[in-house]
Amino acid sequence: MAAPKRKKSKAKTAMRKAQWMRKLTVPGLSLCPECGQPKTPHRVCPHCGYYKDKEVVEVV
């Protein structure tokens, strides 16, 4: 099994662990055609309950 030849510094370890944060992307938002509120694509609108011009969930 491979073993490191030198100890990784705290800075190198922190840089490696911080890389996942740079890879994150903000989820795209689209506007609901029924109510005009922003929603995530391919999901039921949480404000009006519509998906593809059909009421899927009854929102009170």
UniProtKB/Swiss-Prot annotation:
<dbReference type="GO" id="GO:0006412">
    <property type="term" value="P:translation"/>
</dbReference>
<keyword id="KW-0687">Ribonucleoprotein</keyword>
<keyword id="KW-0689">Ribosomal protein</keyword>
<dbReference type="Pfam" id="PF01783">
    <property type="entry name" value="Ribosomal_L32p"/>
</dbReference>
<dbReference type="GO" id="GO:0003735">
    <property type="term" value="F:structural constituent of ribosome"/>
</dbReference>
<dbReference type="GO" id="GO:0015934">
    <property type="term" value="C:large ribosomal subunit"/>
</dbReference>
<dbReference type="InterPro" id="IPR044957">
    <property type="entry name" value="Ribosomal_bL32_bact"/>
</dbReference>
<protein>
    <recommendedName>
        <fullName>Large ribosomal subunit protein bL32</fullName>
    </recommendedName>
</protein>
<dbReference type="InterPro" id="IPR011332">
    <property type="entry name" value="Ribosomal_zn-bd"/>
</dbReference>
<comment type="similarity">
    <text>Belongs to the bacterial ribosomal protein bL32 family.</text>
</comment>
<dbReference type="InterPro" id="IPR002677">
    <property type="entry name" value="Ribosomal_bL32"/>
</dbReference>
